[in-house]
From Swiss-Prot:
InterPro entries: Ribosomal_uS11, Ribosomal_uS11_bac-type, Ribosomal_uS11_CS, Ribosomal_uS11_sf. Part of the 30S ribosomal subunit. Interacts with proteins S7 and S18. Binds to IF-3. This is Small ribosomal subunit protein uS11. One of its GO terms (molecular function) is structural constituent of ribosome. GO terms for biological process: translation. SUPFAM superfamilies: Translational machinery components. Located on the platform of the 30S subunit, it bridges several disparate RNA helices of the 16S rRNA. Forms part of the Shine-Dalgarno cleft in the 70S ribosome. The keyword rRNA-binding applies. GO terms for cellular component: ribonucleoprotein complex; ribosome. Keywords: Ribonucleoprotein, Ribosomal protein, RNA-binding, rRNA-binding. NCBIfam families: PRK05309.1, uS11_bact. Belongs to the universal ribosomal protein uS11 family.
Length: 129
Protein backbone atom coordinates (compact mmCIF):
# COMPACT_ATOMS: atom_id res chain seq x y z
CA UNK A 1 0.00 0.00 0.00
CA UNK A 2 1.20 3.48 -0.83
CA UNK A 3 1.67 5.81 2.09
CA UNK A 4 -0.51 8.90 2.05
CA UNK A 5 1.19 12.21 2.67
CA UNK A 6 -0.36 14.07 5.56
CA UNK A 7 -2.18 17.17 4.38
CA UNK A 8 -1.68 20.22 6.54
CA UNK A 9 -5.04 21.88 7.16
CA UNK A 10 -4.55 25.63 6.90
CA UNK A 11 -6.87 27.87 8.84
CA UNK A 12 -8.69 30.19 6.49
CA UNK A 13 -8.63 33.83 7.50
CA UNK A 14 -12.09 35.20 8.15
CA UNK A 15 -12.71 38.91 7.91
CA UNK A 16 -14.70 39.68 11.06
CA UNK A 17 -14.44 43.09 12.73
CA UNK A 18 -16.79 42.55 15.71
CA UNK A 19 -16.67 39.55 18.00
CA UNK A 20 -17.92 38.17 21.30
CA UNK A 21 -15.44 37.04 23.97
CA UNK A 22 -16.86 34.29 26.17
CA UNK A 23 -14.89 33.94 29.42
CA UNK A 24 -15.77 30.86 31.50
CA UNK A 25 -13.98 31.12 34.81
CA UNK A 26 -14.35 28.18 37.18
CA UNK A 27 -12.54 27.46 40.43
CA UNK A 28 -10.15 25.15 38.54
CA UNK A 29 -9.60 26.68 35.08
CA UNK A 30 -10.37 29.61 32.77
CA UNK A 31 -11.62 29.14 29.20
CA UNK A 32 -11.58 32.10 26.78
CA UNK A 33 -13.42 31.67 23.46
CA UNK A 34 -13.77 34.46 20.91
CA UNK A 35 -16.62 34.02 18.43
CA UNK A 36 -18.25 36.09 15.73
CA UNK A 37 -21.65 37.64 16.47
CA UNK A 38 -23.40 34.45 15.27
CA UNK A 39 -21.51 32.25 17.74
CA UNK A 40 -19.02 30.59 15.37
CA UNK A 41 -15.70 30.14 17.17
CA UNK A 42 -12.74 32.09 15.80
CA UNK A 43 -10.18 31.47 18.55
CA UNK A 44 -9.99 29.84 21.96
CA UNK A 45 -7.48 29.26 24.73
CA UNK A 46 -7.52 27.75 28.19
CA UNK A 47 -5.21 28.06 31.15
CA UNK A 48 -4.53 24.32 30.89
CA UNK A 49 -3.64 24.56 27.20
CA UNK A 50 -1.16 27.32 28.03
CA UNK A 51 0.87 24.79 30.02
CA UNK A 52 -0.42 25.47 33.52
CA UNK A 53 -1.26 22.34 35.49
CA UNK A 54 -2.99 21.68 38.79
CA UNK A 55 -3.76 24.59 41.09
CA UNK A 56 -1.78 27.03 38.89
CA UNK A 57 -4.54 26.80 36.26
CA UNK A 58 -6.92 28.68 38.54
CA UNK A 59 -4.66 31.75 38.99
CA UNK A 60 -5.38 35.16 37.45
CA UNK A 61 -2.00 35.01 35.67
CA UNK A 62 -2.98 31.81 33.86
CA UNK A 63 -6.26 33.45 32.79
CA UNK A 64 -4.28 36.46 31.58
CA UNK A 65 -2.06 34.29 29.37
CA UNK A 66 -5.07 32.42 27.94
CA UNK A 67 -6.86 35.69 27.14
CA UNK A 68 -3.75 37.09 25.44
CA UNK A 69 -3.40 34.04 23.17
CA UNK A 70 -7.10 34.03 22.27
CA UNK A 71 -6.98 37.77 21.50
CA UNK A 72 -3.91 37.41 19.25
CA UNK A 73 -5.51 34.52 17.34
CA UNK A 74 -8.77 36.46 16.93
CA UNK A 75 -6.96 39.56 15.71
CA UNK A 76 -5.51 37.45 12.88
CA UNK A 77 -9.12 37.03 11.71
CA UNK A 78 -9.58 40.80 11.77
CA UNK A 79 -11.42 41.18 15.09
CA UNK A 80 -11.03 44.67 16.58
CA UNK A 81 -14.04 45.06 18.90
CA UNK A 82 -15.38 42.52 21.37
CA UNK A 83 -18.36 42.28 23.66
CA UNK A 84 -17.35 40.30 26.77
CA UNK A 85 -19.65 37.70 28.35
CA UNK A 86 -18.31 36.45 31.70
CA UNK A 87 -19.58 33.27 33.31
CA UNK A 88 -18.56 31.60 36.56
CA UNK A 89 -17.12 32.44 39.99
CA UNK A 90 -13.39 31.98 39.30
CA UNK A 91 -10.46 34.25 40.06
CA UNK A 92 -9.51 34.83 36.41
CA UNK A 93 -12.49 36.94 35.39
CA UNK A 94 -11.10 40.45 35.77
CA UNK A 95 -7.57 39.49 34.72
CA UNK A 96 -8.84 38.03 31.44
CA UNK A 97 -10.89 41.16 30.63
CA UNK A 98 -7.92 43.45 31.37
CA UNK A 99 -5.66 41.35 29.14
CA UNK A 100 -8.12 41.47 26.23
CA UNK A 101 -7.92 45.27 26.41
CA UNK A 102 -4.13 45.24 26.75
CA UNK A 103 -3.78 42.96 23.71
CA UNK A 104 -5.38 45.66 21.54
CA UNK A 105 -9.05 44.66 21.42
CA UNK A 106 -11.63 47.34 22.13
CA UNK A 107 -14.11 46.11 24.75
CA UNK A 108 -17.55 47.55 23.96
CA UNK A 109 -19.61 45.86 26.70
CA UNK A 110 -19.13 43.54 29.67
CA UNK A 111 -22.01 41.27 30.73
CA UNK A 112 -22.16 38.75 33.56
CA UNK A 113 -24.07 35.71 32.31
CA UNK A 114 -23.41 33.42 35.29
CA UNK A 115 -26.36 31.02 35.60
CA UNK A 116 -28.14 31.50 38.93
CA UNK A 117 -30.66 28.81 39.95
CA UNK A 118 -34.10 29.75 41.27
CA UNK A 119 -33.50 27.05 43.90
CA UNK A 120 -32.87 24.22 41.45
CA UNK A 121 -30.62 21.23 42.16
CA UNK A 122 -29.30 20.51 45.63
CA UNK A 123 -25.66 21.71 45.85
CA UNK A 124 -22.84 19.28 46.72
CA UNK A 125 -22.00 18.85 50.40
CA UNK A 126 -19.50 21.28 51.97
CA UNK A 127 -15.84 20.27 52.00
CA UNK A 128 -14.26 19.52 55.36
CA UNK A 129 -10.48 19.79 55.25
Amino acid sequence: MAKRTARVKRRERKNVDKGVAHIRSTFNNTIVTITDVHGNALAWATAGAMGFKGSRKSTPFAAQMAAEKAAKDAMEHGVREVEVLVKGPGSGREAAIRQLQAAGLEVTAIKDVTPIPHNGCRPPKRRRV
